[in-house]
């Protein structure tokens, strides 16, 4: 009896690390010290910071992993993992520095695992952060063969004086919604249930490009870090930002607002992607459930003065993102019909 007969192939693990080395090292920033394979990743803080604040975030991809593995969308789900973490930490105005990943599997599949890590590295390159390290755990008997789970961890930095924490938000500020790529990485327990029960079939085509539903569902989550850096670099006066994840706009937009203020959103101010209408029809979903589960086409929100909206929209367009003014900040009213005025409570 040996470790391999127990289900753990150490040699395959070494070969896997060698295979991903080039992709990982391509993400490294000048501040990275050393290379892949040490007990810990090392990185200097960027030069010129006076009062740096570190911002951290950790997340996973949820049950989107189930669909991704069924349809061999390993690269895309690696991007999803980075996006779920990076899109959170940048809401404070921070610059992502490095990313760590954790991957657990029942039996190491070098091709699939390499695709995942290459997707993670792709997401890191797009976000300007280093893939500083990670852990791949082979756990036979705990996970079924061919299945894996993912978790990610990101650290970013922001000058304390430049921290975006909602304190500057005022009544009358505009809410700019930035387009999502689709469902992103939330609500997939419901999505999977709909796919199990629907009669239309997962090969149904949706949207202006007639994309197969499965392909539309597995599009990677948009990464908003480069766009936010562009906006801040142009001195856009961003007062707050929200990453629209689980709970949709009603549960995420209020998180970035100070006490005494609330958001008012016009649900007809942007076009709802056909994919969400398809999910609603096939799942016979109530409108409230739709709003409180999915992003409905808005993946990220900026709160900024009305005077800055036109310039911000131009920068969004130049960066390849559609955007819409979807509402404004108003004084909080008592009693409230819901967390966001204009949307189902």
Curated annotation (Swiss-Prot):
Keyword flag Cell cycle: no
Subcellular localization, as worded in the UniProt entry: Cytoplasm
Cited SUPFAM superfamilies: PurM C-terminal domain-like, PurM N-terminal domain-like
Principal cellular location given in the protein's record: cytoplasm
Catalysis performed (reactions): 2-formamido-N(1)-(5-O-phospho-beta-D-ribosyl)acetamidine + ATP = 5-amino-1-(5-phospho-beta-D-ribosyl)imidazole + ADP + phosphate + H(+)
Superkingdom as given in the UniProt entry: Bacteria
GO biological process, one term: 'de novo' IMP biosynthetic process
Gene Ontology molecular function terms on file: ATP binding; phosphoribosylamine-glycine ligase activity; phosphoribosylformylglycinamidine cyclo-ligase activity
EC number: 6.3.3.1
A Pfam cross-reference name: AIRS
Pathway where it operates: Purine metabolism; IMP biosynthesis via de novo pathway; 5-amino-1-(5-phospho-D-ribosyl)imidazole from N(2)-formyl-N(1)-(5-phospho-D-ribosyl)glycinamide: step 2/2
Keyword Cytoplasm part of the UniProt annotation: yes
Similarity field: Belongs to the AIR synthase family.
Name of the protein this chain belongs to: Phosphoribosylformylglycinamidine cyclo-ligase
Organism of provenance: Synechococcus sp. (strain WH7803)
Name of encoding gene: purM
């Amino acid at each position: 009896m040996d470790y391999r007969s127990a289900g753990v192939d150490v040699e395959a693990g070494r070969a896997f690390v060698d295979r991903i080395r080039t992709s990982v090292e391509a993400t490294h920033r000048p501040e990275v010290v050393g290379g892949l394979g040490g007990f810990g990743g090392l990185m200097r803080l960027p030069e010129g910071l006076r009062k740096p604040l570190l911002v951290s975030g950790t997340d996973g991809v949820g049950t989107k992993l189930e669909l991704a593995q069924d349809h061999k969308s390993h690269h895309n789900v690696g991007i999803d993992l980075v996006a779920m973490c990076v899109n959170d930490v940048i809401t404070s105005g921070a610059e992502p520095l490095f990313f760590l990943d954790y991957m657990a599997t029942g039996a190491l599949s070098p091709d699939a695992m390499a695709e995942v890590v290459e997707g993670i590295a792709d997401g890191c390159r797009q976000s300007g952060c280093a893939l500083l390290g990670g852990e791949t755990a082979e756990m036979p008997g705990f996970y079924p063969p061919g299945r894996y789970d993912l978790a990610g961890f990101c650290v970013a930095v922001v000058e304390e004086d430049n921290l975006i924490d909602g304190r500057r938000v005022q009544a009358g500020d505009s809410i700019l919604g930035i387009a999502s790529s689709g469902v992103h990485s939330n609500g997939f327990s419901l999505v999977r249930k709909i796919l199990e029960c629907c009669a239309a079939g997962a090969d149904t085509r949706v949207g202006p490009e007639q994309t197969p539903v499965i392909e539309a569902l597995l599009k990677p989550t948009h990464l908003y870090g480069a766009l936010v850096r562009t906006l801040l670099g142009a001195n856009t006066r961003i007062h707050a930002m929200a990453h629209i994840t689980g709970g949709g706009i009603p549960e995420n937009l209020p998180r970035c607002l100070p006490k005494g203020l609330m958001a008012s959103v016009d649900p007809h101010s942007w076009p709802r992607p056909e994919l969400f209408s398809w999910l609603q029809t096939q799942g016979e979903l109530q409108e409230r459930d739709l709003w409180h589960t999915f992003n409905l086409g808005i993946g990220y929100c900026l709160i900024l003065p009305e005077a800055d909206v036109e310039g911000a929209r131009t920068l969004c367009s130049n960066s390849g993102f559609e955007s819409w003014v979807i509402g404004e900040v108003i004084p909080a009213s008592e009693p409230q019909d819901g967390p966001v005025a204009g949307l189902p409570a």
